[in-house]
UniProtKB/Swiss-Prot annotation:
It comes from the Bacteria. InterPro entries: P-loop_NTPase, PanK, PRK/URK. Its main location: cytoplasm. GO terms for molecular function: ATP binding; pantothenate kinase activity. This is Pantothenate kinase. Its EC number is 2.7.1.33. SUPFAM superfamilies: P-loop containing nucleoside triphosphate hydrolases. It comes from Vibrio cholerae serotype O1 (strain ATCC 39315 / El Tor Inaba N16961). Belongs to the prokaryotic pantothenate kinase family. The gene is coaA.
Length: 312
């Protein structure tokens, strides 16, 4: 373990972090991992065992501690209502691997007996519909804070946190690049994972609006998936090129016109999108929230985690 002077984090290299697994068994198979990983992620069994099992163990301990505290409070108050869910936020750039991290943690955490019901929600579902974004002239800023229906997202998390049954969340389609008519129902989970670009934004980002409420106000634990911006740009372009050969060709795909581009044109387009939208959003809105996370997963080449930072 490396502990930089004056750092609010404990820093672990891969070897030392892996030792914190503490003999927790791996309950997922190679085929399970293949289903969980994103199109451009490289999730190996070694990565799952050495990085994500220790993290799942840590989260299990946090959840157990919260459940114990809730039990004491309920006993004191004579309250028989079910405890609120433990809410985990996962933030980071586009193409850094947030979704794979979220899906893997959901699968691992649901194996523990004291919190078997784990739900995963992405903030994509709370983007404004394309029609609204177009009317407001911010279609080019999709993914930026102003493109989200924050009020609706906060209401959703608040209702789930309050223990309300059958809370609904809108569903986003990456195929049509828009909100669908489908709704996801979340019914009193033990753990709720919220994955999205800006889940760690707080009042520090909006000092002029002291009464604004944020998703970060409801988080019990937060994770930031980090990597060098040049690496993320490389991953984004690689993912774009793979989508061009697959998802972009599907009927109804919003991005079908990109399939007509040559290889060089497609790569140039992906780089342009990164520089004008995703890279800009990372620098302006996402990266500044990294230091608020309870835990940071620092990735290197091939999407493998090289370092873990845990807040003291």
């Amino acid at each position: 373990m490396i502990e930089p002077i004056m750092s609010p984090y404990l820093t672990f290299d891969r070897q030392h972090w892996a030792q914190l697994r503490n003999s927790v068994p791996m309950t997922l198979s190679e085929s399970d991992l293949k289903e969980l990983q994103g199109i451009n992620d490289h999730l190996s069994m070694t990565e799952a065992v050495e990085i994500y099992l220790p993290l799942a163990r840590l989260l299990n301990l946090y959840v157990a501690a919260r459940q114990s505290r809730n039990g004491v409070l309920h006993q004191f108050l004579g309250n028989t209502e079910s405890a609120p869910p433990f809410v985990i936020g996962i933030a980071g750039s586009v193409a850094v691997g947030k979704s794979t991290t979220a899906r893997l943690l959901k699968a691992l955490l649901s194996r523990w007996e004291n919190h078997p019901k784990v739900e995963l929600i992405t903030t994509d579902g709370f983007l404004y519909p394309n029609k609204v974004l177009t009317e407001r002239g911010i279609m080019h800023k999709k993914g930026f804070p102003e493109s989200y229906d924050i009020r609706r997202l906060v209401e959703f998390v608040s209702e789930v946190k309050a223990g309300q049954p059958n809370v609904t969340a809108p569903v986003y389609s990456h195929l049509t690049y828009d909100i669908t008519d489908e709704m996801k129902v979340v019914d009193r989970p033990d753990v709720l994972i919220i994955e999205g670009l800006n889940v760690l934004q707080s009042g520090m980002d909006y000092p002029h609006d002291p009464h604004r409420v944020f998703i970060s106000d409801f988080l019990d634990f937060s994770i930031y998936v980090d990597a060098d911006s040049q690496l993320i740009e490389k991953w984004y372009i690689e993912r774009f090129m793979k989508f061009r050969q697959g998802a972009f060709k599907k009927p109804g795909s919003y991005f079908s016109h990109y399939t007509a581009l040559t290889e060089a044109q497609a790569e140039q387009k992906a780089r342009s999108i990164w520089e004008t939208i995703n890279g800009k959003n990372l620098v302006e809105n996402i990266l500044p929230t990294k230091g608020r996370a309870h835990l940071i997963l620092r990735k290197g080449l091939n999407h493998t985690v090289e370092e873990v930072l845990l807040r003291k």
